[in-house]
Amino acid sequence: MDSSFSQKIVVLGTGGTIAGVTTGAPELGRYRAGEVGIEEILRNSRLVGVKPHFELMVEQVCQIDSKDLTVEHWQVLLSRVKAALLNPEVKGLMITHGTDTLEETAFLLSWLNLTSKPVVLTGAMRAFDAHDSDGAQNLRDAMQVLQALIEHRMGGVRVVFAGSVYPGHWVQKTNAQSLNAFQSGPNDDRAELIEWGANWRPRDFEPPADVWPFVRPNLNTILERGTWPRVDVVMSHAGLVGGSVLQALVEQKRALQNPQPSAKLGVDLEGLEGLEGLVVAGTGSGTWSESMREPLLELMSMGVTVVLTSRVPWGHEELRGHPLLISQESEDNFLEDLAKTPLNSQTQALFSRLQPLKARIALALHLMG
């Protein structure tokens, strides 16, 4: 394209089903993700409607099945996003992504609150060469939404999928097969249907209030660090005996802090990073099995930061009685105290609403701050 164009849109490809190719009988729905490059995907999608004053700058960041997404992939993606956002000629970004972890990347970009420029993510539920592939239409919709956001000077992170626009902070994959695979609330009340027409403009989603009680790390800090702190997720569930997973984490943490006896415990420490944070996906409105009490206390005594949230996707927006962040300085009777503690800060309510995997990202970023 003509390099004299002053307005650019960056398109970053990362693989996923939208880049997948079918294997075997089409009716079985089997495919390999991340096989097709972003240039070919864009050519196939016939991106009609790209306005003449926009130039597309296309880059292949990675070609993976998004279930295999790593921190290293995120680091590369963040570096490319940073480069694009620092370029005054770039007006917006589109990222193609596998749906399995799309919500995590969307949350990461939204939580970092990088820029006033719009970022749109999209993907597909059917492979690139499937007869019923939805990727091309999702791409066309995403490009139209991105251009509308640019023209209305609206920033933020959004996911465009199956004719709807979702705020990056709240979006969640809720269906493993349907083309309409995402939601952003119990009644999808945070989603916006795309209504094409001369006067249509995207809704200006209100971003989450910036009440996270700790400083979010600067993007440069994240990129310079390279590695992220290890943060795991454990779930409270029926039949939990002795907090078995937690107990294993305790034994591992002990061995890392005192490696000499580790051989006796049968703990292999090679290549293992010490646990720094733990997200507990509690039941209901953020409750937990009593059997988790002692191992949680021991992990906290060894310096692990513990965050409580709920495994239930919706309905705990107004959690009562559960401060979210628990530091190792908390008293031993913290679990009993939690039940007596009224919700007295906006901070607790906001972080309570985070689903476990998003809470994990927020906690990891906090530990880097």
Predicted regions and their residues:
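ATP/NTP phosphate-donor binding region
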Residues: 1-84, 314, 333-341
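Accessory alpha-helical/coil subdomains and C-terminal extensions
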Residues: 6-8, 12, 24, 37-50, ...
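A glycine- and small-aliphatic-rich helix-loop capping segment at beta-alpha/alpha-beta transitions
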Residues: 24-35, 101, 107-119, 135-141, ...
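Short, well-structured alpha-helical segments in soluble
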Residues: 75-88, 249-252, 267-269
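A short helix->loop->beta-strand "cap" motif at the edges of active sites that frequently abuts
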Residues: 90, 115-118, 301-306
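Short Gly/Thr/Asp-enriched flexible loops that form oxyanion-binding sites at enzyme active sites
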Residues: 95-117, 288-297
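Internal gly/pro-rich beta-alpha loop/helix module
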Residues: 121-200
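C-terminal non-catalytic interaction/assembly regions of soluble proteins
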Residues: 265-268, 282-369
